């Protein structure tokens, strides 16, 4: 199955929320999903009901097979938190990730697994993890807001460069405009610009929706909180488009066809 990297040059765009609910969308459809948190903030676990006191994570397991450490959080859904860490542990972790073909060699049982869809969450901007995973990442999802700060990044994306050129690996990058509000003129203008300029690289838009915030506060998916919400519908549409782009079908609980991965092996 494919590896999807969710990354953004800008923080505060709702990236981790997108990761969590996208994972829920795929698992609800029958796909076996593993979510991996590469962000030292270690916040993704909170979207899946893990305790603040739970210190488990991949940061202390750089040379061990992560698939045996996956935590079951829902039907068809597993996660690997980043874990509690200090500066020295993060330095050792980054050094391990620098190994040639780290994800193909050390972590191949997870990242080259035909029965698992991997969705990886990253800290904003360039990171060693984002650099290292480029060799196995099939698609990069880049959440941005429909605001002035994000507009300043559009020209870099359109020219093919951002985050040290990492955007563009595999099948390339796809933009998600998050928290859109059509009552705001700038929001509407940014949407129109994105539609005209990114075209097929605009994966979709997610409406600003209090249901998302409330669901996160209760550590559940937006589908469990309100499956009829605008954001739930938007994320479902995006998930289906991702599956179409990557060329896989969801069938009764597992899997699928990923010709791109086979070509890369």
Which stretches of residues belong to each language-model region?
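P-loop NTP-binding core
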Residues: 1-265
